[in-house]
Amino acid sequence: MSVTSIMDDLKRRMDGAISAFKHELSGLRTGRASASLLEPLTVEAYGSVVPIKQVANISVLEPRMLSVSVWDKTMVGAVERAIRDCGFGLNPIVDGMNLRIPLPELNEERRKELVKIAHQYAEQARVAIRHVRRDGMDNLKKLEKEGEISQDEARSLSEKVQKLTDDAIADIDKILIMKETEIMQV
């Protein structure tokens, strides 16, 4: 394994951890309507369970109102049930093949709960990044032991790995602060 491939792999895996963190955060409900809120939902359709995006189009009508346009009239009931049962306390209003979903205000207690969950997601992402860092350091030590790189090169590369790690964790912290601000905004 070459030094370049090790560094590229580290960067790719750290970026993957950040992307996964962003994806987890997108599922957290804030006070503002977002189509990504309903994306994780699944609907029982045509004898199997499919993502809601495969049977309907989700859009934002107003800051506190989502619209779900179901493509097949027979699926309206199943989509409505999935939204009602998702655990977000949403009550869709059926209007033909469209569902309007007003988002209720979040109370202070629920906002703090969501911030706590966001912090847990952030910590999981930081741990994932530290695991990637450890793997990179282990690979560098192995290359040094095998004589493919000198001790000085290993030290220099270790510092680069540490910088990559610090940058990735700083990105996570920045994303977390933005999400926290969004959640706590009344």
Swiss-Prot record:
Transmembrane segments: none annotated. It is found in: Cytoplasm. The lineage of its organism: Bacteria, Pseudomonadati, Pseudomonadota, Alphaproteobacteria, Hyphomicrobiales. One of its GO terms (biological process) is cytoplasmic translational termination. Coiled coil: none annotated. This is Ribosome-recycling factor. GO terms for molecular function: ribosomal large subunit binding. One of its GO terms (cellular component) is cytosol. Belongs to the RRF family. The keyword Ligase does not apply. InterPro entries: Ribosome_recyc_fac (IPR002661), Ribosome_recyc_fac_dom (IPR023584), RRF_sf (IPR036191). The keyword NADP does not apply. Responsible for the release of ribosomes from messenger RNA at the termination of protein biosynthesis. May increase the efficiency of translation by recycling ribosomes from one round of translation to another. It holds the Pfam family RRF.
